[in-house]
Regions:
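Long, charge-patterned amphipathic alpha-helical coiled-coil/hairpin "stalk" segments used as oligomerization
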Residues: 97-131
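Short, conserved aromatic-histidine micro-motifs
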Residues: 155-170
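Conserved short S/T/G-enriched processing/targeting/catalytic segments and their helical context
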Residues: 1-97, 124-156, 172-182
Length: 184
């Protein structure tokens, strides 16, 4: 359970996350560092905390190649698959290799990409996106802000979306953490 929220205004990319770690019967507010920088990108991981730790500390850095963000992400995903295999966090289901119960939100070159557990890359058309159990609440808050709020720094919008998710999703909790990067 979590909320990972990204927003860009075309100048700055901000990625934020809550601090809840949830088990079957327990919610722990901790320092999980669900969002971090990796090379040229911003990365947020929902699902198992161990997967996020492995990607953050042992994963290949995400580098932006001359061929653009999607080919760069494909190379990074392949490097992650090779590196994460020995860690035991990949599984095969119906002949498809999966990242066990996790998804990622990646910011690269001013764009957001969701990478699901089957390594599929989806690029939303909006300048914002969210993943985790608080996804729908955060997306609703971001949509409402985009349509009526005066321009605000992306961090203010991400913070408001995280507060909305924490208010209405029992698996999302403050404090929130943020990483940001200028758009190249």
């Amino acid at each position: 359970m979590t909320a990972i929220v990204g927003y860009t205004d075309g100048h700055t990319m901000v990625l934020g996350a809550d601090s809840a770690a949830v088990t079957d019967r327990l919610l722990i507010v901790c320092e999980p560092h669900k969002v971090f920088t990796s090379g040229a990108g911003l990365v947020g991981v929902s699902g198992g905390l161990r997967i996020g730790q492995l990607i953050r500390f042992q994963g290949a850095p995400l580098e932006l190649g001359d061929d653009g963000p999607v080919p760069s992400l494909l190379r990074w995903i392949q490097a992650l698959r090779v590196g994460l295999g020995p860690a035991g966090v990949l599984r095969t289901k119906d002949g498809i290799e999966e990242l066990a119960d996790s998804r990622m939100l990646v910011g690269l070159a001013g764009r957001w990409f969701e990478i699901d557990s089957e390594w599929q890359i989806v690029e939303p058309a909006s300048p914002y996106w969210a993943i985790g159990s608080g996804q729908l609440i955060a997306l609703g808050a971001l949509h409402a802000m985009a349509s009526w709020m005066a321009p605000r720094h992306p961090r203010a919008k991400v913070t408001a979306a995280l507060h909305a998710a924490a208010m209405y999703d029992p698996g999302v909790r403050a404090p929130f953490e943020f990483v940001e990067r200028p758009v190249p």
